[in-house]
Amino acid sequence: MNVSERIAGALYGFAIGDAMGATTEFMSPKEIEREYGKVDDIIGGGWLHLKAGEVTDDTQMMLCVADALIDSDLMFGSSSFLSGCCSNFVAWFNSKPKDIGNACREAIARCKYKPFSEWFDVALSKDKLGNGALMRCLYPAILYAITGKVVFKWAAETQGNLTHFNSVCRRYNREYCDALQSLSSRCRSRRSGVSIFLPHQAGAET
């Protein structure tokens, strides 16, 4: 399995796990057993009343960040990446998704069409410690793990500031990147096909 296949597997695995896990979110083991018995397939339902295979805000916001990163000139500055994240979050918010976390909802609703610097002001809070920032950072974390380029670790950390601006959330995004890098170190030498997942400008980097 080459690196591009591993990256695709991580992204598909994220979405599949989201679609499967949403069925029993917020349920106790006893409630799950009573309602479903054993969940070993993607069946939808749950408190969001999802269709089988439908994903939640976790996957949807992760893809917002991934799209912004792919379209950015991140290697030459941060503004296009962060502005892209903001624009993608707003477009997603306007699509009326079934669920949005409280911190994400507040930031997007209050900062629509404003510069990303104003998002930081709204998101600044030591109490916003949910996983909303972490759930979105998979794509830049993967690219950091595979390439070792610190700019991708920075992207994973900084996109979180748009909705969860505090040191705790920044730390766990950095640690997530480090964990992925450690796990992927064995395949670092087999980079075949990885350039198709990089931002347009970064693909030319060695």
Model segments located where?
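Structured, active/binding-site neighborhoods that engage oxygen-rich ligands
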Residues: 1-206
